[in-house]
Design a protein with these regions (language model features):
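N-terminal redox-cofactor-binding region of secreted/periplasmic oxidoreductases
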Residues: 1-107
Length: 107
């Protein structure tokens, strides 16, 4: 199976890693979607298929399956909010929330 991230980038996805920008940029778009999880990704696909210019914003990095580290101690800090240490306010429940393009659906 082809890597969907590499296929998308080769097919014309525009990817900007804002952490590498020297200064702010202005982006002209019809729709801005914050969060690239299941809901954001599907919505972006539908809106772009309808001819709208869509920008997705995500806190974490764009990772391909070839970028994933298989050791949990290496992977968690890169893929989860707060290195997978996020908890409810009373600290009773751990919250595994993805911090990468695709959000929790990726991890």
């Amino acid at each position: 199976m082809d890597d969907p991230i590499r296929v998308g980038l080769a097919g014309g996805w525009k990817h900007i890693d804002a952490s590498t920008l020297a200064r702010s940029q202005t982006v002209d778009t019809d729709v801005l979607i914050v969060g690239t999880g299941a809901g954001g990704g599907v919505t972006a696909d539908l809106l772009s298929a309808a001819g709208l210019r869509v920008v997705l914003v995500e806190e974490g990095p764009l990772r391909s399956s070839t970028d994933f580290k298989m050791r949990e101690s290496d992977a968690y800090p890169e893929l989860y909010q707060e290195s997978a240490a996020r908890k409810t306010a009373d600290k009773a429940i751990n919250i595994l929330q993805g911090r990468c393009v695709g959000g929790s659906t990726t991890v």
